[in-house]
């Protein structure tokens, strides 16, 4: 499925890369990322998934959905939204 199809029901800003890419899975648990995944960064009481971006990129994530300001890593699409929890619900 194309990333742009998952994003069509919400407001977002492309920080880097393209939405015209094929994705395999939608995940919010960094341990479950695989090649061509979209990783949605959820900030929790104990940990902040934004901290795991370098790890998921190494695992092959094709795109990252963030709500905080981050420095993009080359070769990965970065999508910024106001609320990543809402974005995850809309994309599911």
Write out the residue ranges for each language-model feature.
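N-terminal leader/targeting and accessory segments in enzymes
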Residues: 1-90
């Amino acid at each position: 499925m194309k990333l742009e199809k998952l994003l069509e029901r919400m407001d977002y800003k492309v920080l880097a890369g393209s939405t015209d890419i094929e994705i395999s899975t939608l995940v919010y648990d960094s341990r479950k990322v695989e090649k061509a995944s979209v990783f949605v960064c959820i900030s929790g009481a104990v940990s902040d998934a934004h901290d795991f971006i370098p790890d998921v990129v190494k695992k092959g994530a094709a795109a990252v959905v963030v709500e905080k300001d981050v420095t993009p890593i080359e070769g990965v699409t970065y999508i910024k939204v106001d609320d990543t929890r809402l974005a995850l619900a809309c994309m599911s």
